[in-house]
């Protein structure tokens, strides 16, 4: 996995593929995971979701699935906001952590910090190599 903390308590990165990755998240102090992968993504990456869910539960990490391709940001941003409002340390991921999860993080910053999508993207990209889809952020 590759990841970084983009703002306090919010990490963006690539998908955990095996239970060992979840144990790494636990060591980092992650208390919640927001997974943006679709069922097709899981199939492609051969992720055993049942096994991963059990490992999250054993690790005392809450997991939220919000499967999206590259739109429907607003509902996802609200979910992310509610998870962070519960004081969780959140790991937000899609597949490679290059597009969807950084886009969601940018959208969250636009909504919460009331900054432009370009400023939000610059902030995240200064900490983490990614290519957020700025053209779909219309908040």
Residue ranges of predicted features:
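Walker A/P-loop NTP-binding motif
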Residues: 106-112
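Residue-level signal for alpha-helical context at structural boundaries
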Residues: 94, 138-139
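Short beta-strand/loop segment at the start of cytosolic alpha/beta domains
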Residues: 1-4
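Cysteine-based protein phosphatase catalytic domain of the PTP/DSP
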Residues: 7-89, 112-138
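A phosphate-binding catalytic loop at a beta-strand-loop-alpha-helix junction
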Residues: 88-106
